[in-house]
UniProtKB/Swiss-Prot annotation:
Residues covered by the FAD-binding FR-type domain: 94-199
Alphabetical list of InterPro entries matching this protein: CBR-like (IPR001834), Cbr1-like_FAD-bd_dom (IPR008333), FAD-bd_FR_type (IPR017927), Flavoprot_Pyr_Nucl_cyt_Rdtase (IPR001709), FNR_nucleotide-bd (IPR039261), OxRdtase_FAD/NAD-bd (IPR001433), Riboflavin_synthase-like_b-brl (IPR017938)
Name this polypeptide is given: NADH-cytochrome b5 reductase 2
GO annotation terms (biological process): ergosterol biosynthetic process
Binding site for FAD: 202-237
Keyword line: FAD, Flavoprotein, Membrane, Mitochondrion, Mitochondrion outer membrane, NAD, Oxidoreductase, Transmembrane, Transmembrane helix
TM spans (from-to): 31-47
Entry GO terms, CC: mitochondrial outer membrane
Compartmental location: Mitochondrion outer membrane
Family (UniProt): Belongs to the flavoprotein pyridine nucleotide cytochrome reductase family.
Chief subcellular location: mitochondrion
Length: 345
């Protein structure tokens, strides 16, 4: 796979990057439930016809079939609700919820993985794909609380906890506070904060252009796509970091690459690579993006960008506000992409 190969000259490989084979479709359903309901109704219909003018028996059979159908549908609905679970975060006027820190795992020299317990063990977070949570912390000498958004890396269907990957930034009030936290302490959360509404096969091909911890919503989206057998979206990841050690979730992306080599490809770029590095060097540039991204004239594509301010400026231009995507600028505009083909997290 190309993500482990040297980035060679762009042109000879362009056609290779553009090609993806189609995989067979498979998806789960409630077939057994609906078949049972249909059988009950069909059986009653047959009984009606076979009994002629026996009105009392026909009426009793109809009631029995209706009751069985309702019971089957009720059981199916309960099964679905049980699988989804109760939501810890419901948005609206819910306000902040205090969550207890369960565990802390050192990921690299400046990043930790934090697992917070949800209020109840059978609850799910309530987040949808590409949504985030707001954290709040007010220290004893702080006049105003620090408010920061984070995208959980735990699966939306996981019950009882959420996971966050947090990089410690110099003078970053929230990240410094979290890196000092120990299990048993608490932090306030609120959400969910919706971003880009995703549904299976919404786009034929998407590209994820990320820098640093901007990878978290990208991972959330890629995981949802490949966890859904019905979703056949093709995914290209371009991920920039300072050093190889800074590449977060690389093992998870390598697993996707190994499992779906015809639908998922990853390209890594390092500002300070080791001598043995065979990937991209420096910054994400126009030549690389022109080579690996779906062409601007392609139908039904979407490009997602998430990273530090300097990356936004160079790649796509920044957002005006959380609700205003702003105009498209930078390399993506130069390559001919339109504003509606790009989403900035």
């Amino acid at each position: 796979m190309f993500a482990r190969q040297t980035l060679r000259a762009a042109q000879p490989f362009r056609s290779q990057y553009r090609r993806y084979a189609t995989e067979s479709s498979s998806s789960g359903s409630n077939t057994a439930l609906y078949t049972g309901v249909a059988a009950a109704v069909a059986g009653a219909g047959y009984y009606f016809m076979s009994q002629g003018d026996n009105a009392a028996k026909v009426k009793d059979a109809a009631k029995d079939a209706e009751a069985k159908a309702k019971e089957a549908l009720g059981q199916g609905q309960a099964k679905v609700e049980g699988a989804v679970g109760k939501a810890a975060f419901t948005g609206g006027d819910q306000g902040f919820i205090s969550l207890k820190l369960d565990s802390v795992e050192l990921v690299n020299h400046n990043t930790k993985k934090f697992r917070f317990e949800l209020p109840e063990s059978d609850q799910v977070s309530g987040l949808h794909v590409t949504s985030a949570l707001i954290t709040k912390y007010k220290g004893p000498e702080m006049q105003k609380p620090a408010i920061r958004p984070y995208t959980p890396t735990s699966d939306e269907g996981e019950k009882g906890f959420i996971d966050l990957l947090v990089k410690k930034y110099p003078n970053g009030v929230m990240s410094e506070h979290m890196h000092e936290m120990v299990p048993g302490q608490r932090l306030d959360f609120k959400g969910p904060i919706p971003k880009y509404a995703w549904s299976a096969n919404k786009h034929d091909h998407i590209a994820l252009i990320a820098g640093g911890t901007g990878i978290t919503p990208m991972y959330q989206l890629a995981r949802a796509i490949f966890n859904n057998p019905a979703d056949k979206t093709k995914v290209t990841l371009v991920f920039a970091n300072v050093t190889e050690e800074d590449i977060l979730l690389k093992r998870e992306f390598e697993d996707l690459e190994n499992t779906y080599p015809q639908r998922f490809r990853a390209f890594y770029v390092l500002d300070n690579p080791p001598k043995s590095w065979k990937g991209g060097k420096g910054f994400i540039n126009k030549e690389l993006l022109k080579t690996v991204l779906p062409e601007p004239k392609s139908e039904n594509i979407k490009l997602f960008v998430c990273g530090p301010p300097g990356m936004y400026k160079a790649i796509s231009g920044g957002k005006v506000s959380p609700s205003d995507q702003g105009e498209l600028a930078g390399i993506l505009k130069e390559l001919g992409y339109s504003k509606d083909q790009v989403y900035k997290f």
